[in-house]
Amino acid sequence: MLALAATAVTGQEAGLGRYGVRWTDIGKGAQAAYIQAELFGSRQCISAIRYPEKRLRMRIVNDPGSEADSTSALALRHGALAAVNGSYFNMKTLEPVTFVKERRRIEGGTTRRETFRTDGLLAVRGRKVDIIRCDTLNYEAATKRCPDVLAAGPVLLMDGWEARDEWPSDSFYTSRHPRTFVGTTRDGWVYLVVIDGRAPGKADGASIHETALIARLLGLDNALNLDGGGSSTLWTRSGGVISNPCDNRRFDHSGQRRVPNAVIIR
C-alpha cells in the first residue's frame, strides 16, 4: 500500500515510481491511472489523467441551465479525449456561481458567497495551462489574454508547497469528501484528478489538507481544487467514467450528477 510523508515533492515521477503506479495510454500522449491506497488512516481511491502540455489542448466548456448534463455527456458533446467536472454551481438552476470564460465569452461570475473557497483561476491560452492565485474578483484583468478561464478553489499547491500554512476550520475544508483538482508540474505535465469518497471502507474521501498532500504525492507543483462531492467525475473517451461518482450513493461508475461546466482535453 502507499504511504505518504508530508514533504515537498517535485518532478512528475518523484512521488510515483517508488509506489508502482501504472499509467495506461489513452491516446495522443495522455495517460490514465487508478490508485488504491491506505493514506491518513483511511482508504483512498484516486483516478488521474495526465498529458504533456505541448501535445494537447485544454478547454473550459460551459453549458448551464437546461443544457447542463453529466461530465461524460458534456465531454462527448464537445469532442473530448478526457474530461473532469468543473467548478461550483447552483444545484437548483444549474448555473455557475464562479467566474467562467469560454472562448473569450464571460459566462459566469463569482458570487460573494463563494469567496470563502474560490481563490484561484485555471487559465488556458493555447496549450499553456496556468493556475493563478487570485484574491480579487477582478478576474478579467488578471486573465485578459486567456480565452478559457475557470475560477475555483481553494488553491492547493503553489510552487510545490501547500498553499496555506493552516486551513480554515469550516467543514468544507476539514471533512472528508470526494474531491476534484487540476494541477501542473514544472516539467510540463498537466493532471486531472478525482479522489472518490462517501463509500466508507472503499473510498473515504479527503479533507482539503489531505487533498493537497495527495497532489504532492502525484508530483504536482501547482494545484487547484474544483467542485467535489457528488459532482466529482473523471472520464476518458476510451474507458468511459473511470472514477466512482457518488450521486447515486453507490460505489460504481454510474453515479454522475448534472453539471454546467467541465474541463476537457482534446
Predicted features and spans:
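Zymogen propeptides
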Residues: 9-121, 128-131
